[in-house]
């Protein structure tokens, strides 16, 4: 929702929002063989600079920075593992251990180096596949919010598949629990902030009576066995909320909060989160918002 009453450029404004979202989708969709990201992963030569557009460079820079800060708990290079498990297809395809080891050997954010002066990436091994799943929605929201502010829009609420951003007004956002989608496990008030949730129950697959979540642990190459059933992150940048909800789900409370403290101390990025513990259903929360 964008409030733009009595403004003659309304259609142009909304078309601009759609164009930005489409541009991100066409650039980053790893399931589209013609997206720029897919073409790069298919055509790059190990050790050779590969020039990219400004949007793809921004994505790579943002996601690799978070991968480094989280010590790989968030890692965009798990795309091949994600595809092998069938995540996104609706059908679980469990890899053998040896096969999984082979896939893990083709992951690792440290295999990618960026060249800002050339707007290029150097990937030093073959077979890297980059997954934008925990970045793309947040990045698109941030681009659109920046665009709306350039047009002096004062109030907006964006919803990209559960990734939210509220601008101007204060909204009360309900966070759904795992047992009953109609029951809220928490209500959060946000203004000029993004909200992103990672959980096993929003997107999962079943096979032989076992449930598999859609989030992959980069260390094991298997679906995450988290101490949380869900993690909801609140941050003034949607892309950080998107990435950090995934990182915290993988890391757990102690290691995750250390990452949040370093973000505030080194970059001034403030993050709140709340999570439901898997062991007892207790809601835990953390805030490092500057007052």
Which residue stretches match the model-derived regions?
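Mature catalytic core of soluble alpha/beta enzymes
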Residues: 1-291
């Amino acid at each position: 929702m964008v409030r733009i009453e009595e403004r003659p450029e309304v259609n142009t404004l909304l078309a601009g929002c759609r164009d930005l979202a489409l541009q991100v989708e066409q650039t980053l969709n790893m399931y589209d063989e013609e997206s720029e990201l897919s073409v790069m992963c298919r055509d790059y030569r190990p050790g050779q600079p590969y020039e990219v557009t400004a949007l793809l460079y921004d994505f790579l820079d943002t996601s690799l920075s978070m991968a480094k800060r989280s010590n790989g708990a968030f890692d965009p290079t798990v795309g091949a593992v994600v595809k092998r498990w069938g995540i996104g297809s609706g059908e679980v395809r469990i890899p053998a251990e040896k096969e999984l080891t082979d896939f893990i050997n083709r992951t690792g954010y440290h295999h990618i180096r960026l060249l800002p002066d050339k707007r290029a990436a150097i990937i030093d091994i073959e077979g890297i596949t980059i997954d934008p799943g925990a970045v793309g929605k947040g990045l698109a929201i941030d681009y659109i919010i920046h665009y709306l502010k350039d047009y002096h829009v004062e109030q907006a609420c964006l919803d990209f598949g559960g990734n939210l951003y509220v601008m101007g007004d204060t909204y009360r956002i309900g966070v759904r629990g795992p047992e009953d989608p109609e029951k809220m496990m928490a209500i959060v008030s946000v203004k000029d902030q993004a909200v992103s949730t990672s959980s096993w129950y929003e997107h999962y697959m079943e096979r032989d009576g076992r449930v598999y979540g859609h989030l992959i642990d980069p260390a094991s190459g298997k679906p995450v066995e988290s101490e949380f059933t869900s993690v909801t992150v609140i941050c003034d940048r949607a892309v950080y909320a998107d990435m950090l909800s995934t990182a915290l789900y993988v890391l757990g409370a102690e290691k995750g909060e250390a990452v949040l403290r370093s973000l505030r101390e080194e970059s001034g990025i403030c993050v709140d989160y709340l999570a439901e513990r898997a062991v007892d259903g207790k809601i835990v929360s953390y805030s490092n918002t500057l007052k």
